[in-house]
Amino acid sequence: MLNPLKKDIVRINNLVVKYGKNTILNDISTRFYSSEIRVILGTSGCGKTTLLKSIIGLLKPFSGTVYIENTQIKDQDDPETVKILKKIGVLFQNGALLGSMTVEENVALPLQMHTNLPDSVIKEIVQLKLAQVDLPNAANLYPGELSGGMKKRAALARALALDPPLLFCDEPSAGLDPVTSAGLDELLLKIRKTLGITIIVVTHELLSIEKIADNITFLSKGALLFDGPLKDALALERGPIVDFFKRHEPNNKFHQSNTTDFFVENIK
């Protein structure tokens, strides 16, 4: 169970999202706290990415409300919604760096679009953001010269360019090897600690969940089945979330890692 006394930065009330006649999210209510790392998980097609897109205004709900910092998110034609969404950082699964631009130019884009800062100040901010994601020497490189992990870090620097209080990450470890994925997890922890921001991560990677999650939001077939601290989920003896851990652990790409034993011992 979530703590009703904590300060929330995102509040979702009775959210319903439909595609045609199909209900993708059914009566979802939850809160994301200030300075936490929240992991949204569930099987493929359960509505994880749909929930993320609904929060950031990319999908209009059938019913229900979403608030970010007490501002209701409506649609991207609403001035107040646009204003608050400019403050939100998003790291999409593919990273989407522009190949014809250097890393520095990619990271500078949000600053050029949404501020009137002089080029010299933008350059300083870009260097700071690249340092924050451990890419201090990558400014003049092009995306094609970067490894998969470096591309994710560069995209993360761009997402942080405007100093957002809230960062959404959609499957950040997708396509990464175990070592690089673990490094990205450590980076997210460092960013949360040093910048004090709220980070919402959509993932199904068990080791990432164990390492970074303060709270988890578990979806199944569009319904919210668990919403609370990771330790409470691991204490459960049965139920859909336990079945999820058991079902995914043998096929997890980290199966040979000793850290996987943590989940094996906690879900028996």
Regions found by a protein language model. Give the residues of each.
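Conserved ABC ATPase "signature" region
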Residues: 119-137
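Conserved ABC ATPase signature
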Residues: 142-146, 150
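Helix-to-loop junction immediately C-terminal to a conserved catalytic motif
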Residues: 56
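Helix N-cap at the start of a conserved alpha-helix in ABC-type nucleotide-binding domains
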Residues: 178-180
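Catalytic Walker B motif of ABC-type/P-loop ATPase nucleotide-binding domains
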Residues: 167-170
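ABC ATPase NBD coupling module
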Residues: 73-89, 233-236
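A short, proline-enriched helix->beta-strand linker immediately N-terminal to the Walker B motif
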Residues: 161-165
